[in-house]
């Protein structure tokens, strides 16, 4: 957070509202460096795909390059979110960029001497995807550390725009480089792109990571999963992302095959197709901030989905390139419209205590659907004509966008996301081992019997709040001997985690849910905290549990 304090935002008239975060010097440097690095990564993917196309590999193998790049997120996204939450994010990025640089340099040499086999290519792509999966949540969670809170939504959108500009521009450059210099040159340029990002990270020595309460790795992972499980809004947004991505990735997976077999293009022609998509992405970077201010999130995603789907159909059916290329420009713009809008919405909505872990689930959906969509498109293209597969994908994208008319994403504006401290946990010494002991919290509400149902209806919001912030089980009871009492009981994994619920996990919206229920009690709430004590025959298990819990992630290392 120190970086925010040292960087005044430039408010000169030349800065439009959507691009205001670029006035923060370190954000501007990191943003530009990440675009360069991501451009190199997408050049790498296209180079790998074209290497297989040159060898007349099947469409399935070509599509598997995308799958090998994206699939590691399915394995490592959630642990990566925990790592990015508690370790120094700058160091995570330094480490990941260095490893990727070494892998790409090795692959460049093997390709230059003609020794790159399909197995080596796919294995290297998988390793690069694995390291990328580890760094992505840390990078996205870095944004709130370096820009003022009021610019977070715009900064999140700019980060997503940068990623998607790279996704379109990188392949375009790669196609042109392959045509002139070969695939090895593409891999070498990717290596140089990592050096750019490393240079910025080494230059940036003033980063002071935010102080986070250390948590055991397993508990931190469970907390992230529990939050997503009980956050209906986040689940709905991620599901909307999946609805678009699975069919949409047919474009990226099958474009090399369509360029060569259907359009008769060489590598340079393929590069021109990608250049058109890249041009649309650049236009989208300028159009999207304006679009977000004149249309709701659902309107932007709906329009972009329909335009993207129409672009896929035109790509295959257009009788002339004079129609194909403008359609691809619109398709690139529409891609940015969907992905950047959803990313900005998720990043702005996630509370700070679980933001990195929440973004790891976003990456899980993003890359998991990329892997599934690419592999599925490759399988279908091995059975049917690739052009028909792309047309079908375009129709599905359009229908998915139109479904927003009847099933829109939930509105998130006006929902308080700031963290507030909730009173109720006394700051007094606890017996030895109490921090690791499971806790049962029992709260007694006093309310007239005729208002009981009103309280129970209100408790639905309280239930979701408790479960999102760490409760493992929750239940409400009515005292059979005292009809005027309603009892809320929930269990938490440890006293330490229960303190976190009160001091670092409750958002303004959550506090409102709790306050609404408490206000209905006619007397002061009776709150009891019960600490679990293991029975003698469980003590061996409890000792191992305590030892494991002490293996917390040391923040800032």
Regions found by a protein language model. Give the residues of each.
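An amphipathic, aromatic/His-enriched active-site/gating alpha helix that lines ligand/cofactor pockets
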Residues: 466-473, 491-527, 557
């Amino acid at each position: 957070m120190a970086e925010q304090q040292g960087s005044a935002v430039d408010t000169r008239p030349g800065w439009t509202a959507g691009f205001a975060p670029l006035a923060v010097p370190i954000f501007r440097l990191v943003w530009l460096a990440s675009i360069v690095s991501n451009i190199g990564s997408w050049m790498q993917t296209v180079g790998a795909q074209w290497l297989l196309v040159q060898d007349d590999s099947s469409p399935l193998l070509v599509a598997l390059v995308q799958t090998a790049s994206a699939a590691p997120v399915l394995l490592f996204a959630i642990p990566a979110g925990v790592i990015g939450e508690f370790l120094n994010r700058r160091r995570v990025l330094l480490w990941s960029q260095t490893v990727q640089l070494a892998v790409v340099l090795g692959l460049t040499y093997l390709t230059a001497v003609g020794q790159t086999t399909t197995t080596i290519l796919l294995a290297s792509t998988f390793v690069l995807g694995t390291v990328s999966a580890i760094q992505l949540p840390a990078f996205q969670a870095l944004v709130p550390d370096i820009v003022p809170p009021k610019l977070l939504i715009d900064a999140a959108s700019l980060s997503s725009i940068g990623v998607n500009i790279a996704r379109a521009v990188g392949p375009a450059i790669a196609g042109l480089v392959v045509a002139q210099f070969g695939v090895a040159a593409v891999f070498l340029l990717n290596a140089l792109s990592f050096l750019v990002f490393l240079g910025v990270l080494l230059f940036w020595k003033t980063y002071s990571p935010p102080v986070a309460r250390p948590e055991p790795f397993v508990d931190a992972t469970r907390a992230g999963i529990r939050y997503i499980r009980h956050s209906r809004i986040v689940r709905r947004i991620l599901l909307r992302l999946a609805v678009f991505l699975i069919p949409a990735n047919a474009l990226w997976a099958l474009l090399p095959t369509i360029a060569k077999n259907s359009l008769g293009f060489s590598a340079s022609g393929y590069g021109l197709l990608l250049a058109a998509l890249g041009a649309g992405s650049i236009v989208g970077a300028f159009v999207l901030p304006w679009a977000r201010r004149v249309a709701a999130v659902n309107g932007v995603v709906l329009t972009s989905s329909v335009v993207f789907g129409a672009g896929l159909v035109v790509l295959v059916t257009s009788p002339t390139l004079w129609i194909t290329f403008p359609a691809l420009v619109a398709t690139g713009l529409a891609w940015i419209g969907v992905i950047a809008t959803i990313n900005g919405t998720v990043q702005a909505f996630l509370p700070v205590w679980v933001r990195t872990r929440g973004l790891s689930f976003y990456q899980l959906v993003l890359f998991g659907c990329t892997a599934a969509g690419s592999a599925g498109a490759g399988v279908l293209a091995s059975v049917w004509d690739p052009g028909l597969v792309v047309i079908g994908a375009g129709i599905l994208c359009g229908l998915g966008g139109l479904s927003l008319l009847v099933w829109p994403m939930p509105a998130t504006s006006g929902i308080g996301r700031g963290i507030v401290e909730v009173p109720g946990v006394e700051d007094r010494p606890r017996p030895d081992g109490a921090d690791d002991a499971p806790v049962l919290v029992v709260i007694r509400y006093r309310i007239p019997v005729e208002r009981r149902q009103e309280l129970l209806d209100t408790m639905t919001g309280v239930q979701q709040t408790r479960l999102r912030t760490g409760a493992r089980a929750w239940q409400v009871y009515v005292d059979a001997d005292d009809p005027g009492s309603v009892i809320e009981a929930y269990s938490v994994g440890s006293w330490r985690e229960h303190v976190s619920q009160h001091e670092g996990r409750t958002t303004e919206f959550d506090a409102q849910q709790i306050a609404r229920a408490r206000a209905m009690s006619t007397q002061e709430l009776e709150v009891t905290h019960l600490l679990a004590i293991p029975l003698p025959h469980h003590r061996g298990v409890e000792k191992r549990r305590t030892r494991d819990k002490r293996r917390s992630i040391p923040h800032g290392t």
